[in-house]
Swiss-Prot record:
Keywords: Ribonucleoprotein, Ribosomal protein, RNA-binding, rRNA-binding. GO terms for molecular function: large ribosomal subunit rRNA binding; structural constituent of ribosome. The gene is rplJ. HAMAP family: Ribosomal_uL10. This is Large ribosomal subunit protein uL10. PANTHER family: 39S RIBOSOMAL PROTEIN L10, MITOCHONDRIAL (PTHR11560).
């Protein structure tokens, strides 16, 4: 990379850090181009991204954005995964890492909280925002359905009694 290109690359990483409250730092050594492409496409469908970064530039960007706490995670062949939705991103990356041993989760940051590999795996077990919304709606609808069932029960029981009496005669 030319010296003149480095400030632009740092600015790109700074923008990612500023716009994405959720970042996972990974090592991608040994992943094939097709595997990286599959991961990028999967992340893109979840409005997330995957960017291979030069460690020194990623550290400079981290220091410029006040994310000094993650600067020590940048060593080796590093790529960052970034998103606005931490749980969906974590699920996708953890599942991809399980299927592809060459992707290693190093750590990350979610809403300025530094996470280690174990914490990211635990995060991936949580429900996503859409799953939580669905569950809450289901819980809110359940009592109404039960009330309707209770109110309809006497009339349906009465109808069965009348039907049984009519069929005897």
């Amino acid at each position: 990379m030319l010296r003149s290109e480095k400030p632009v690359a740092v600015e790109d990483i700074v923008n990612i850090y500023k716009e994405s409250p959720s970042i996972i730092i990974t090592h991608y050594h040994g992943l094939t181009v097709s595997q990286v492409s599959v991961l990028r496409e999967a992340l893109k469908s979840k409005e997330a991204g995957f960017k291979v970064v030069k460690n020194t530039l990623a550290k400079i960007a981290a220091n410029q954005t006040g994310l000094n706490s993650i600067a020590n995670l940048f060593a080796g062949p590093t790529a960052i995964v970034y998103s606005k939705e931490p749980v969906e991103m974590a699920k996708l990356v953890v599942n991809f890492a399980k299927a592809n041993d060459n992707l290693k989760i190093i750590g990350g940051i979610v809403d300025n909280h530094v996470l280690d590999e174990h914490s990211i795996k635990e995060l991936s077990k949580l429900l996503t925002l859409n799953e939580l919304r669905g569950k809450i709606i289901g819980l809110l609808q359940a009592p109404a359905t039960q009330v309707v069932g209770v109110l309809q029960a006497p009339s349906s029981s009465m109808a069965r009694v009348i039907q049984a009496y009519a069929s005897k005669n």
